[in-house]
């Protein structure tokens, strides 16, 4: 469904150059749910802006369903739906009018628009509010309407740019129920950018992006196995964090530590060592508490980039 080859995007301004996307290669199959994970500034939004024909690449090639995004942008747009990170609804129109306008842009006939609007607004529990102005909607309701609108023309590819940012956990779960239902019904490909680990965890595959580079692509489980079987989390004094990091690097070769200013440090348990207790007994300073957990995608990002997601 998506073929990306040596994609680069460079922004130039006042004599300076910024490489937003740096020679990435990626293939995504039809019906696949792919998540692109990374912090702000990693290049995620630039990548989907090229994918959705909003931006042109500096170099490389991108195809959607066999169509080149530079050569055939209008045809590509017919095949994609996109939910932007920032709101894009017209709040002076009603929910139904927003759906109607979107359907007209995609050339749907009046009967098609009527059928699709009713089915999708019912799916996202907004049919009873269809005549209300969008300006009266809560943030969660607006997000649900944006999803319904993005599905109006039954796209082959749904692009989601941080679709649940700023929403409460309950609303986020509801949004994803709608997305997964639509994907199952229509065999749609989903391309998600997010920094919510639990959203990326439900994808078929995850790409880890940092500073414009795609540093890893695999299933969530395989990526987490690269970290190791377990992660140790320690609570200590904040001024003891650096000595512990230095000790771990010097004697165990551990450089992939996650540290916060409150005195918490986490790191993968070295394979072949005598266990967590044996390591902790050798560490400098006072250890106030210890827990052991399975690796998550944040640990993957730290190992791949040497940095925290935040």
Which functions belong to the PLM regions below?
Residues 158-161:
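Catalytic Walker B motif of ABC-type/P-loop ATPase nucleotide-binding domains
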Residues 100, 104, 111-129:
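Conserved ABC ATPase "signature" region
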Residues 232-304:
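Short, charged/small-residue-rich alpha-helical element at the C-terminal edge
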